[in-house]
Swiss-Prot record:
It is found in: Cytoplasm. The lineage of its organism: Bacteria, Bacillati, Bacillota, Bacilli, Bacillales. Residues 1-243 form the Deacetylase sirtuin-type domain. The keyword Zinc applies. This is NAD-dependent protein deacetylase.
Length: 243
């Protein structure tokens, strides 16, 4: 492990176009449940009596707008979550002008909360909301502080700005993500199993020098990586910062 940390530190210190690709594992230490792991968010959502895929779908929003927004307020707001040391470390590398930015599968908005400016959120973010009818924009603070569920302009359901089942990923976001990967000298994957498509397929576009994967479990790209560390991200970053 010590040798891996030394290798990781050397690669990070010698890179100046790092792109980060992050998944659910990064935010677990902040109290955000992993969606699909045992005991994760999907398990919790299943207790509501409908399938997680339906509750997080465009169909549910259209079939039962009131039920959808009540579900969002109950399960998705993550009111007390804060960035952890991994989010802070990534933001610091961006401030030091070593990083091109972040591509994330997460919807919790914690990278932005940590101060990162260049974040491509493939599945959207819970930091932004909008009316499903007139598209008036709202912040997360608007929704939480006022327990706001209906648009004060037209009365429509206020939904989070996330990609629901049955909706397309935002193409400008995909293009920006591809650009970050194609121009990176080092790609660091953190807390992602790299199996969810089409997001995970972006990794195949990396042609830079070093692919680093830090994840508790194996991924389909482990054999292609310069360095693989199967460990907890928080532990790795803490150790890295004391090296």
């Amino acid at each position: 492990m010590k040798h891996d940390l030394e290798t990781l530190k050397h690669i990070i210190d010698s890179s100046n176009r790092i792109t980060f690709f992050t998944g659910a594992g990064v935010s677990v230490a902040s109290g955000v449940p992993d969606f699909r792991s045992m005991g994760g968010l999907f398990d919790e959502i299943s207790k509501d009596g409908l399938s997680p895929e339906y509750l997080l779908s465009r169909d549910y929003l259209e079939d039962d707008p009131e039920g959808f927004i009540n579900f969002c307020h109950k399960r998705l707001l993550f009111v007390d979550t804060m960035p952890n040391i991994v989010h802070d470390w990534i933001a610091k590398l961006e401030r030091n002008q070593q990083s091109l930015g972040i591509i994330t599968q997460n919807i919790d908005g914690l990278h932005s909360d940590a101060g990162s400016q260049h974040v491509d959120e493939l599945h959207g973010t819970l930091n932004r909301f909008y009316c499903n009818v007139c598209h008036k924009s709202y912040t997360k603070s608007d929704v939480i502080d006022r327990t706001l569920k209906h648009c004060d302009n037209c009365g429509g359901a206020i939904r989070p700005d996330i990609v629901l089942y049955g909706e397309m990923l935002d193409q400008p976001t995909i293009i920006r993500a591809l650009n970050k990967i194609e121009h990176a000298d080092t790609l660091v994957v953190l807390g992602s199993s790299l199996v969810v498509q089409p997001a995970a397929g972006l990794i195949s576009h990396f042609k830079g020098d070093n692919l680093i994967i830090i994840n508790k479990d194996r991924t389909p790209y482990d054999s292609d990586a310069t360095l693989v560390i199967h460990d907890d991200m928080v532990s790795v970053v803490k150790s890295l910062m004391t090296e």
